[in-house]
Amino acid sequence: MAPALAVTRDLTAVGSPENAPAKGRASVYSEVQSSRINNTLPLPSVLKGAFKIVEGPASSAAGNPDEIAKLFPGLYGQPSVAVVPDQDAPSSAPKLKIGVVLSGGQAPGGHNVISGLFDYLQERAKGSTFYGFKGGPAGIMKCKYVELNAEYIQPYRNQGGFDMICSGRDKIETPDQFKQAEETAKKLDLDGLVVIGGDDSNTNACLLAENFRSKNLKTRVIGCPKTIDGDLKCKEVPTSFGFDTACKIYSEMIGNVMIDARSTGKYYHFVRLMGRAASHITLECALQTHPNITIIGEEVSAQKQTLKNVTDYMVDVICKRAELGYNYGVILIPEGLIDFIPEVQELIAELNEILANEVVDENGLWKKKLTEQSLKLFDLLPEAIQEQLMLERDPHGNVQVAKIETEKMLIQMVETELEKRKQAGAYKGQFMGQSHFFGYEGRCGLPTNFDATYCYALGYGAGVLLNSGKTGLISSVGNLAAPVEEWTVGGTALTALMDVERRHGKFKPVIKKAMVELEGAPFKKFASLREEWALKNRYISPGPIQFTGPGSDSLSHTLLLELGAQ
């Protein structure tokens, strides 16, 4: 057996230019990383031979089609397309000049979208030029880019992270910013641009496509669906990349914590999971690991639950488990829980208003300006959370909701309620809470076989769409429960995913976030099992992500259930 220290490989020693690391990339890789770099990915059969683009019927919008039509006069109504085999189609295309940008937070697989797009250009449009815009959309506006070639891309194949060209959260939305993007497109003579991002980024990609078309620029814009949160999806886009990997990383850690809880027999682990809006990650991790309690934000909202309702539900389960001799357990909480509780939102709105105009006095006279319901809720909160609400403001003077550590708040609220029940003789157990936040750990892991392959197909498909003269579409790969060879490839009209929101008196286009559907198969399966999980320890420890052998090609429960394949 090789010694433990021999698990790294210096790619500079390989001698092949394809394996030379890009500037700024660590040159030392683990054995697993090295094996992933050199792993060849399969493509859907339709992308292996000659093919053509077939257009579907005219599209509409997810909501308010009349308003979307006004906002996108050049793109609205365009059809979605499918790539289909065609032996008579040419197998090669004229060379192109293409740019790519990573936008928003990291998600495992982003590098493979770029690799797939690059390989399409190498194989089908020989002699093409490929630019990577550095640091997100700001790189487009400032014309900061790097020319991507085989040597530069190779060390990033099948690797996590966005560090090949890095990402950013800037938006191209003002007239000046659109003008900067136009100047960059003209300067580099771009035939196309691929925007890899979430719902906001793809909304901006559509606005950019509309702008370029209105100015008669030849630059076409295609989006790719990225977000670990899993809230960018529809019938044609079954999942966003990164969700599969992130959920498996979190589920491994949750499984480890479960075994720890069972081993010590004395801790309740409160685990907050990333997902600012939708609770998809929390639901998927619950299906993978079977925790005792899982809070789904969309259900809390639908049932108009209060913070006390949520706390009482947890305490009820903890008391029942204590009667069975279990003084331990695992509780999953979505990051965006606070946003789903109407009374908390009302309290925050009132605090923002009061603190914008008042100095908070130590005697608490300012509290008289709160409504009765908000005052009652404020007094219910632990002191540390009260201080956080009062003191930590963003640059606009508002409460920083994202910084509220919900898991710690709930531990304190559960402790308080359990103490009351103990005094009343209704609880005889022992309670010790441990808090965790699993978030950043899942954003840049080595992508699973599914995410690596899915992203590669998305990138290759984006190249096909650009070469076919399409713009304002999002690269779409479907039939994902089937073997890779049978996956379908196409493009979905971005305007078909859009609705409008009223902001500052104007309609703004937005791609609607896909929330957890309480009538959907994933939630229904969870709901049918949660009572059993609450009192019986049905813990599953999935272990680390596998790249070969059992479990290596498994798909998320959410995807399989939504596709009707489980």
Curated annotation (Swiss-Prot):
Phosphoprotein recorded as keyword: yes
Result of knocking out the encoding gene: Retarded growth and reduced pyrophosphate--fructose 6-phosphate 1-phosphotransferase (PFP) activity.
KW Magnesium (keyword) present: yes
Pathway(s) where this gene product acts: Carbohydrate degradation; glycolysis; D-glyceraldehyde 3-phosphate and glycerone phosphate from D-glucose: step 3/4
Record site feature (Important for catalytic activity and substrate specificity), residues: D200
First-level EC class: transferase
Keyword annotations from UniProtKB, A to Z: Allosteric enzyme, Cytoplasm, Glycolysis, Kinase, Magnesium, Metal-binding, Phosphoprotein, Transferase
Cofactor(s) the record lists: Mg(2+)
Transmembrane segments: none
One of the protein's GO biological processes: fructose 6-phosphate metabolic process
Main location per the UniProt record: cytoplasm
Location of the active site: D229 (proton acceptor)
Residues binding Mg(2+), per UniProt: D199
Regulation (activators, inhibitors): Allosterically activated by fructose 2,6-bisphosphate.
GO molecular function per UniProt: 6-phosphofructokinase activity; ATP binding; diphosphate-fructose-6-phosphate 1-phosphotransferase activity; metal ion binding
Annotated catalysed reactions: beta-D-fructose 6-phosphate + diphosphate = beta-D-fructose 1,6-bisphosphate + phosphate + H(+)
Residues the record lists as Phosphoserine modifications: S16
Record: residues binding substrate: T227, I228, D229, K266, Y267, M274, G275, R276, E335, Y440, E441, G442, R443
Described purpose of this protein according to its UniProt entry: Catalytic subunit of pyrophosphate--fructose 6-phosphate 1-phosphotransferase. Catalyzes the phosphorylation of D-fructose 6-phosphate, the first committing step of glycolysis. Uses inorganic phosphate (PPi) as phosphoryl donor instead of ATP like common ATP-dependent phosphofructokinases (ATP-PFKs), which renders the reaction reversible, and can thus function both in glycolysis and gluconeogenesis.
Subunit structure and binding partners: Tetramer of two alpha (regulatory) and two beta (catalytic) chains.
Record-stated family: Belongs to the phosphofructokinase type A (PFKA) family. PPi-dependent PFK group II subfamily. Clade 'Long' sub-subfamily.
Matching PANTHER family: PYROPHOSPHATE--FRUCTOSE 6-PHOSPHATE 1-PHOSPHOTRANSFERASE, PYROPHOSPHATE--FRUCTOSE 6-PHOSPHATE 1-PHOSPHOTRANSFERASE SUBUNIT BETA 1
Listed name of the protein: Pyrophosphate--fructose 6-phosphate 1-phosphotransferase subunit beta 1
Source organism of this protein record: Arabidopsis thaliana (Mouse-ear cress)
